[in-house]
Each structure stands twice: as structure tokens, then as C-alpha cells.
């Protein structure tokens, strides 16, 4: 079994989801959201995200990590802050020795619901289909689980291609 953490980075809320995969099977382990205090300065908020994610990685001991890529919007300040939160989301698992993969939002949706553009409710429904025991509160945790599933599908495809080349 390979344990994967998916991370949906955000300065206010960073979602995380842990799954295990073996072949085509997926198993829900845990999910949640790390929040930062909007009344604190940026550095302190980033520390809150770092410490919260480090605790999750330490507690659940994933083998690999996947983080959603950011999109650039018209608000440059918001994009920069999201980029800083994303840096934390990549740094924490990397410092724990995990390989960190990155996926575009449309690749995540395609892996979970079959198309690159879809509604949050479609993702929630498919998470329950793929992992009936999955529990998630809010979009951030659901998105993080979807990111982990996307990585599980992609790592399986890569492993299959490597096996075909070797054999």
C-alpha cells in the first residue's frame, strides 16, 4: 500500500487528504483543513500552516505527496499570497523526504469526474463513489482528497509504462 497526502493550498484554509492505494483500489484514511488566523501577520499565518501540515505529515506518515498548482488571477497580491501558502504545502512534505508531485486543477477534476471542468458537487459525489467511507468537511478537504486520487491514478499509469518498457 502506498499512502498519499493530497494538499489544496490556501492562506486562509489549506485542505489535506490522506488515502492509500494498491493497484486500482483506493482507501480513505483521513482529511481535514488547516486554518490560519486572518488577524495575524503573513509570516505568522504561514507558520500556522507549516506547523499544522507538519503535524499531519508526522501523524499519518504518507509515502508521497501531491499539491495542486496555482492559477494566476487578476489580483496579484492574492496570487502571491497563495503562492506562499503553496510553497509551505510543497516544503513540508519535501522536508519529510517525500516526493512531491504537482497537478493542474483541470487534471485533478479529469482524474476524479472524467472531465477537466466540473462542479464541486460532482467531485464530492465521485469521492463517495470511489471511497464510500470518505469523510470530508468542506471543499478544501474534498479538493485535497481529489488531488491525492489524481496522483494515485497518475503514479499507477507511470508504473505501468515503466513495467511495459522493462518487460
Curated annotation (Swiss-Prot):
Cofactor annotation remark: Binds 2 Mg(2+) ion per subunit.
Claim: Cytoplasm is one of the keywords in the record: yes
Names of the cofactor(s): Mg(2+)
Binding site for Mg(2+) 1: 8, 140
Entry EC no(s): 3.1.21.10
Active site: 8, 68, 140
Keyword Nuclease found: yes
GO molecular function term, any single one: DNA binding
Keyword set, alphabetical order: Cytoplasm, DNA damage, DNA recombination, DNA repair, DNA-binding, Endonuclease, Hydrolase, Magnesium, Metal-binding, Nuclease
Location within or outside the cell: Cytoplasm
Pfam families: RuvC
SUPFAM superfamilies associated with the record: Ribonuclease H-like
One example of a Gene Ontology biological process annotation: DNA recombination
A GO term from the CC aspect: cytoplasm
Protein origin, superkingdom: Bacteria
Residues annotated as binding Mg(2+) 2: 68
Catalytic activity entry: Endonucleolytic cleavage at a junction such as a reciprocal single-stranded crossover between two homologous DNA duplexes (Holliday junction)
Record's subunit section: Homodimer which binds Holliday junction (HJ) DNA. The HJ becomes 2-fold symmetrical on binding to RuvC with unstacked arms; it has a different conformation from HJ DNA in complex with RuvA. In the full resolvosome a probable DNA-RuvA(4)-RuvB(12)-RuvC(2) complex forms which resolves the HJ.
Similarity comment: family membership: Belongs to the RuvC family.
NCBIfam families in the cross-refs: ruvC
Function: The RuvA-RuvB-RuvC complex processes Holliday junction (HJ) DNA during genetic recombination and DNA repair. Endonuclease that resolves HJ intermediates. Cleaves cruciform DNA by making single-stranded nicks across the HJ at symmetrical positions within the homologous arms, yielding a 5'-phosphate and a 3'-hydroxyl group; requires a central core of homology in the junction. The consensus cleavage sequence is 5'-(A/T)TT(C/G)-3'. Cleavage occurs on the 3'-side of the TT dinucleotide at the point of strand exchange.
Name the UniProt record assigns to this protein: Crossover junction endodeoxyribonuclease RuvC
Organism, scientific name: Sinorhizobium medicae (strain WSM419)
Lineage: Bacteria, Pseudomonadati, Pseudomonadota, Alphaproteobacteria, Hyphomicrobiales
Amino acid at each position: 500500500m502506498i499512502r498519499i497526502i493530497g494538499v489544496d493550498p490556501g492562506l486562509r484554509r489549506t485542505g489535506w487528504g490522506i488515502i492509500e492505494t494498491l493497484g486500482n483500489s483506493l482507501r480513505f484514511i483521513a482529511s481535514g483543513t488547516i486554518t490560519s488566523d486572518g488577524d495575524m501577520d503573513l509570516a505568522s499565518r504561514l507558520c500556522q500552516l507549516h506547523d499544522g501540515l507538519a503535524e499531519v505529515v508526522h501523524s499519518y506518515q504518507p509515502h508521497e505527496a501531491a499539491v495542486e498548482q496555482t492559477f494566476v488571477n487578476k489580483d496579484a497580491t492574492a496570487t502571491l499570497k497563495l503562492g506562499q501558502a503553496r510553497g509551505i504545502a510543497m516544503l513540508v512534505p519535501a522536508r519529510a523526504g517525500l516526493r512531491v508531485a504537482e497537478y493542474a486543477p483541470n487534471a485533478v477534476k479529469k482524474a476524479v469526474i472524467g472531465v477537466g471542468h466540473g462542479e464541486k458537487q460532482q467531485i464530492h459525489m465521485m469521492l463517495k463513489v470511489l471511497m464510500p467511507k470518505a469523510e470530508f468537511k468542506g471543499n478544501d478537504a474534498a479538493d485535497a482528497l481529489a488531488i491525492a486520487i489524481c496522483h494515485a491514478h497518475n503514479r499507477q499509469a507511470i508504473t505501468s509504462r515503466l513495467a511495459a518498457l522493462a518487460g
